Amino acid sequence: MKRIFLKIAVYCLSAVVMGSCVYDFVPDSSDLQGIEKPLVVIEGDIIVGGMTSVALKSTSPVLGGIEQDGISYAGASVWVENEEGAIWQGEPSQESGVHVVDTRGLSQEGRYRLCVSVPDRGEYRSAFKQVMVSPPIDNVSYEKADDNSCVQFEVSTHNSASAPLYCRWTFTEDWESNSELTAEIRAKYKEGKVYMEDIPEEEREEASRCYSHGNSTGIYIGSTEKLSQNVIDRERLHTINATDKRISSLYCMNISQTAMDKEAYKYWEVTKSSISGTGGLFAPMPSEIRGNITSVTFPDEKVIGYVNVSTESVKRVFVYAHELNMFKRNCNGVLYPEEEEGDNVWFSLYFSGLVPIRYELKENGDPDKSQAYWTSPDCVDCRIFSNSSRPAYWPEGR
């Protein structure tokens, strides 16, 4: 049988839509049936008492060295329904392929499923599931490595019930992605010459204070099944290196916790193990844990995804750079004269991609406009690497 390679672009985490991950893999022979067409990927849990976000993605088959088109979800509809037939209709969000369903009014006593209708593909449904109640997040802590090379973030929770606790976590991040240096001047080129001009104070502020946003891209799960107590203590979420700009000023993590049953936990456990062990989200898995979504229109069609039904516990934590005292700054300015031995040094620096920061100062404090400090652009303009605006919840004065 012809070997078919797939490039998978899927959203790795649900509830809050996560950043995409791409994996290359070779399916086993049983997975090749019908794989010439892209597979539907449905990602998102039903959040009882909150907003449900569902990402519609697809695999992209690569046949004969040519990557085939994925599935178009134009005109798709998403809804949640209970066993009595009541429907909560979703709406497309601003992000392509993402639909949002208002499930704040759902009762914890009901059983619910997710339904998706895709033009030219048919209807897809997850299995009805009861609502799992997530306990509160007890604490989000962090611990610095002994060599100060990184900081590790951890989450703790517990359940007073006797049944084992199965949890999954996702998180979003916001941080001040400020520039390490502030430029007071900039270089301009005109008629074969490089000259300097002052940067207005307002523009200096815009270039020196920025904000960025990120989403978790891993699978974070925990269980008390094999523990003597129903306590998940300091389960590691992720690690940030000491040179990462996320911890250069003020960092915030918004953590979402959902509870799940053993079946859902097993799905994510094997998926996580498969990714780390073979490099592919769709490495061979036992058929009984492929997911809980089926095609109503074509029952034999393979669908990727697992829809859990749970309440959501959230916690937000702020970490200031001075609390960690570990961010390693890499930016410095180097002093260069305008001319040296008849050569225009600034001309060469300008066309090398470097930028000026400020003039050297004379003994009396006045600027020496024949000498200036230069550095790389990303050291003085945080807009180069920022991707967001100031969050509404950000502390005043920041």
Feature-to-residue mapping (PLM):
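Bacterial N-terminal signal peptides that target proteins for export
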Residues: 1-10
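C-terminal motif of bacterial Sec signal peptides marking the signal peptidase cleavage site
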Residues: 17-20
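A sequence/structural signal for flexible, mid-protein segments enriched
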Residues: 22-398
